[in-house]
Amino acid sequence: MDNLQKAEILRQHETYCYQVCYCLIQDEQQSFQAASRALLEVARDPVFFTDTVDGQKKKVVLAAVRCITHARSDQASLQ
């Protein structure tokens, strides 16, 4: 699978990932940042691209939650 095909698959999950993040954070800028990090995380997983659409969505949600949790723990440690 070439990079253009991988980018297309990631684009298919972009809005969904942002929606998940926004639902949990309720802040546009932080949601955008968390969604970007989550998509980069799943992009590093070669199995992601050969998984079913449902499997990909589950991985996107898990990555989004991980990124949000990580960002919040980083934020708490700064305070």
Task: Explain the meaning of each model-derived region.
Residues 1-7, 18-37, 50:
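Short, charged helix-capping/linker segments at alpha-helix termini
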Residues 1-19, 43, 62-73:
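A short, charge-rich alpha-helical start-of-domain segment used by transcription regulators
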Residues 36-54, 75:
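Sigma70-family region 2
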Residues 55-59:
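Short, charge-rich amphipathic interface segments used for partner binding and complex assembly
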